[in-house]
Amino acid sequence: MNYDYFQLSLHVFPVHFKEDINPDSNLVDILITSNKCGIEDGDVIVISQKIVSKQEGRAINLETIIPSELSIGIASAYNKNPKLVEAILSETKRIVRMEHGVIIVQTKHGFVCANAGIDESNVDGNYITLLPKDPDSSAKLIQNEIRTKTGKKVAVIISDTFGRPFRLGQTDNAIGIAGIESILSYEGKPDTFGKILRVTAIAVVDELCSAAELVMGKTNKSPIAIIKNFQFESKDDHISNLIRPEFDDLFK
């Protein structure tokens, strides 16, 4: 088989921000003026959750939070700030596990993660950032604004860093999507030996987030990456399709 290696390759470009993001910022305007590679039809724009949360006013001063008795009790038992625990519980659908100073919950979005996705990094002072209330809607709004201002049809993925239950280290995962399918299914297709694949489904949006994170990093003020040359069908999907149903959860 003759491969077209250009067609099989991805090109991932970081977008460096010179300014911090706040509710008065316009992410799309900054993206358009700051990127060095241009925006074209078929690009995948991966955006860090942190800047979306900041722009949507989801950065909260811990000092404004009044912890409940439950939060104070949990904080005492697990050596955490009771104000932070209160913020975690406010974003939580159910507590999955609390051990070794770690609180694993299912968020109201359905994500299972530490601290309900609440983060204290890359924000000033006593501030924390909560996840966007509706990351799919956030991604769709950004996608539409890019289309309006550039005329280009792109996919948008909002990413966040999650731990993994049976492996060390974190990876970036999609928490909101627009214009791209969340899963690429190979079910029913033959493998290289002609065997029919039955259960292979690739979480492509998560893999794209991990590729993007390699150039975005955590400390170089590049909260957006533009992925070029990824072949995909433009289609609206929902991040909920990546969440395993509870009846399929063997570990709950």
Where do the PLM segments sit?
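N-terminal and secondary-structure boundary signal
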Residues: 1-252
